[in-house]
């Protein structure tokens, strides 16, 4: 978790991890800070724009989750761990929330428009079919034309990869392809 400044050689480690959580406004990641960039290139840039949570969640795709504060960050980490096994020998935890796996999702009849040229929100489909309509986005702000998220069906953890018709008509590009590959 990146909750404060992380610069120089220390920033290599997070980039090699499976999941990076970054706190908005306080978490920063960059090889070289704004002062060095200014002295070398003459360009003035602030630390937030250079390596802040918004930059790494929306633009570079280096971070996978953005938290509003340290407490939110820890809570998001706990939530992610609830979807994952403790090690490669274990299965992911099964967590039942009382959602009937045999329920009918009537809203699926109206989510996808009759006109094939109209976009729809794939998140509406995900909410309709997952336990309690709950899911956890992975890289949710990056490459929005591809959805990657964790969810549950009948209490069992699953990963979902889906094109998002509301963003670029769901067309694939290099960024969303990279996002899906990292998720897999």
Predicted regions span which residues?
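Conserved catalytic cores of soluble enzyme domains
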Residues: 1-89
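Short hydrophobic/aromatic-rich motifs at helix boundaries and adjacent loops
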Residues: 25-26, 97-98, 155
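Short acidic (Asp/Glu) and glycine-rich catalytic loops that position anionic groups and cofactors
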Residues: 33-34, 54-61, 100-108, 159-164
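Short capping/connector residues at structural and topological boundaries
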Residues: 34-36, 41-45, 50, 55, ...
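Short, exposed beta-strand "edge-strand" segments with a Pro/Gly-rich flavor and a Y/T-containing core
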Residues: 39-44, 61-68, 111-120, 165-172
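Terminal amphipathic helices with adjacent charged low-complexity linkers/tails
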Residues: 65-126
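Non-catalytic terminal/interface segments that mediate subunit docking, oligomerization
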Residues: 118-184
């Amino acid at each position: 978790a990146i909750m404060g400044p992380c610069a120089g050689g220390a920033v290599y480690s997070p980039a090699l991890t499976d999941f990076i959580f970054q706190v908005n406004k306080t978490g920063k990641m960059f090889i070289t800070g704004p002062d060095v960039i200014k002295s070398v290139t003459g360009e003035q840039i602030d630390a937030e724009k250079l390596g802040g949570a918004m930059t790494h969640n929306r633009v570079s795709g280096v971070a996978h989750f953005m938290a509003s504060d340290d407490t939110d960050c820890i809570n998001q980490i706990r939530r992610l761990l609830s979807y994952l096994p403790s090690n490669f020998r274990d299965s992911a935890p099964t967590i039942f929330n009382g959602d009937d796996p045999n329920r009918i999702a009537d809203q699926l009849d109206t989510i996808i428009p009759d006109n094939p040229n109209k976009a729809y929100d794939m998140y509406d489909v995900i909410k309709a079919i997952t336990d309690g309509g709950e899911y956890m986005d992975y890289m949710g702000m990056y490459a929005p034309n591809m959805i990657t998220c964790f969810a549950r069906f009948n209490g069992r953890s699953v990963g979902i990869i889906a094109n998002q018709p509301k963003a670029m008509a769901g067309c694939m590009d290099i960024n969303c392809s990279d996002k899906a590959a990292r998720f897999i």
